[in-house]
Design a protein with these regions (language model features):
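Transmembrane-helix signature of 12-pass secondary carriers
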Residues: 1-426
């Protein structure tokens, strides 16, 4: 048992809570647009291109936020950045609610995305560094499952505010901004990660790992693209990119898919979307108990394999109607197995000195995939049809599955010193 495994339980729970709260807000703010865009499009008279840009704007912002805040987290510390990124949630959530035209809304959602993107590497790195090695994945999976709780809450708030009329979406955006404020106040009181302090030579003790054991010979950002670390960077970025093409390409359109191919009523669409979200939470609960026993590699391969099979079969049989709800509920449940591993693999494979930077880079690349999926899905549905589009996304999952077979490393029940990769082969 390492020194970090012996940290007080209260510290671990506090870090888990503040990280989970970040993922909750991520899920809320990213998901809320998927239903609201239908009303925004009509209110502002958006063109199809403008509608696509508004829908994808937060994902575009995440590309830049993940790299920036991931790098800053390695430079100045995890705790200092955790409060700053949520300021973006509060400020630009409010400006989104007050937007009067396409430009204002696009810029507001883009800058909101910068904060969301920044929270991914910082929150995931922090929870990984505070969690005990024997049950690290339960902490990690439990925290990211809050993303789908945020998604469910966004649907619930939409349901409650929908009677207000076409302007309801402004209140939904405002709610997301307001709930971020108390979380900011809690985060600014969080202690710094001991691992980060060791990596900087600030914290030294005979019971602690040596500074060189934490850093593995890596000194800066560019070392992510050298030697053995380059292979890790390529693996986590490429697989996550391919996963997000399908995950976000379909996921942000669940309400629109249900409206187009299943239900005519807005309320039926909302209920269907909430059922799908419950499926995701069930998937995370199952994954939480399996990943530390079966291992990351097995769960990742099973998740990607199930996604591939379901998407391709769904396209072949041309699935439609109310059956889409249990179909997508099953899909997202198994999708979370792969999703949890792709999200947290970088935190175990990169050493402390560039853990947040590596996570930020991988997040950024994954969001490029998400933007491509979100942008091209409606185009593919129009030109190729819904069923063929499912098959195309299924193929991206097959490619991710193949790369994972070749490159996925098992890290279960090992300390971060054991799982992280340095410039030289250990």
């Amino acid at each position: 048992m390492s020194y970090f495994d012996k940290l007080p339980k209260g510290v671990k729970i506090r870090s888990f809570f503040v990280s989970s709260a970040g993922f909750f807000l991520d899920g809320y703010d990213l998901s809320v647009i998927s239903f609201a865009i239908y009303f925004i499009e009509h209110e502002m008279g958006l063109s199809s291109v403008e509608t696509g840009l508004v829908t994808a704007s937060s994902l575009i912002g995440m590309i830049f936020g993940a790299i920036l805040f991931g790098w800053l987290s390695d430079k100045v510390g995890r705790s200092r950045i955790m409060g700053i990124d949520l300021i973006f949630f509060a400020v630009f959530g409010i400006t989104s609610a007050l937007s009067q035209n396409f430009i204002q809304l696009f810029i507001s959602r883009l800058l909101l995305g910068v904060g969301i993107g920044g929270d991914y590497p910082v929150s995931s790195t922090l929870i990984a560094e505070f969690s005990p090695s024997i049950s690290r994945w339960r902490y990690l999976t439990g925290s990211v499952s809050m993303y789908w709780v945020g998604t469910l809450v966004s649907a619930l708030i939409t349901l409650l505010t929908l009677p207000l009329g076409a302007y309801y979406w402004r209140w939904v955006f405002l709610f997301g901004a307001l709930i971020s404020i108390p979380i900011i106040l809690i985060r600014i009181r969080l202690i710094e990660s001991p691992r980060w302090l060791v990596s900087k030579g600030v914290l030294k003790d005979s019971n602690l790992p040596k500074q060189e054991d934490e850093n593995k010979g890596i000194k800066g950002y560019l070392d992510l693209f050298k030697g053995n670390v380059l292979l890790v960077t390529l693996f986590v970025s490429l697989v996550w990119f391919l996963f997000d093409v399908a995950s976000y390409g379909i996921g942000l359109y669940y309400p629109l898919i249900l409206r187009e191919f299943a239900f005519p009523s807005n309320y039926e669409v909302l209920y269907g979307t909430m059922v799908i979200g419950i499926g995701a939470i069930i998937g995370y609960i199952i994954a939480e108990f399996l990943i530390d026993s079966l291992g990351r590699r097995v769960v990742l391969l099973f998740g990607l394999g199930a996604m591939s099979l379901l998407l391709i079969l769904g396209g072949i049989v041309k699935i439609f109607g109310f059956i889409l709800v249990p179909y997508f509920m099953t899909f997202v449940a198994l999708e979370q197995w792969a999703g949890a591993v792709t999200l947290f693999y970088p935190t175990e494979l990169f050493p402390t000195s560039v853990r947040s930077s590596g996570q930020g880079f991988a997040t950024s690349i994954s969001r490029i995939g998400a933007v491509l999926g979100v942008f091209y899905f409606p185009i593919m549905v129009k030109d190729l049809g819904f069923s063929t589009s499912l098959i195309v996304f299924g193929i991206t999952c097959v490619i991710a599955f193949i790369f994972s077979i070749l490159m996925a490393k098992e890290t279960k029940r090992k300390t971060l010193e054991e799982t992280s990769v340095g410039l030289k082969r250990s």
